[in-house]
A protein has these predicted regions:
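Short helix-capping/linker turns of helical repeat alpha-solenoids
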Residues: 5-6, 21-22, 35-38, 51-53, ...
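Structural signature of tandem alpha-helical TPR/SEL1-like repeats
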Residues: 19-28, 56-65, 92-101, 128-139
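Canonical positions in the second alpha-helix
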Residues: 32-33, 67-69, 104-105, 141
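TPR/TPR-like (Sel1-like) alpha-helical repeat modules
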Residues: 100, 104-107, 111, 115, ...
Length: 143
């Protein structure tokens, strides 16, 4: 999605407000951009709903925003979708869906996806325990 000059300024200001923990202001700035289909703004909205930052915690809304962002190939949202499916947060718990999304994150080089999937295999969390696969993923992540 191409942003005009004002929208770029709103995005940057919204991200800065989020970083500075001015969650209500971040919501005001990022929400219109998310509604217009901006993937990063959608991801940030998901995180805000997921954690109750500036808005009441709402796992269903978080999953909706995360999926919209992930479907636009926003890489951090791939990890977010994996986490949501792993935990059953806003979606039905589904280890195979979690693996699918974490694998996309791994392909993009996301260390968080590597380590989280490694822990799933190490602990047998929704999957059959596989210490060798866990070790391979941890090495890939630099551990």
């Amino acid at each position: 999605m191409n942003l005009n000059e004002d929208e770029i300024m709103d995005l940057n200001s919204g991200l800065k407000a989020l970083e500075d923990k001015h969650f209500t202001r971040a919501l005001q700035l990022l929400s219109p951009l998310a509604e217009k289909g901006h993937a990063e703004a959608q991801h940030r909205m998901a995180v805000m709903y997921q954690n109750g930052l500036g808005i009441h915690r709402n796992e269903t809304a978080a999953a909706l925003w995360m999926k919209l962002s992930a479907d636009q190939d926003y890489e951090l949202a791939w990890h977010g979708m994996g986490f949501m499916y792993m935990e059953g947060e806003g979606v039905d718990k589904n280890a195979q869906e979690a693996i699918k999304w974490f694998s996309k994150g791994i392909d993009a080089g996301l260390i968080g996806s590597m380590t989280t999937l490694a822990m799933m295999y190490k602990e047998g969390n929704g999957v059959e325990k596989n210490p060798q696969e866990a070790e391979r993923l941890l090495k890939m992540a630099g551990f």
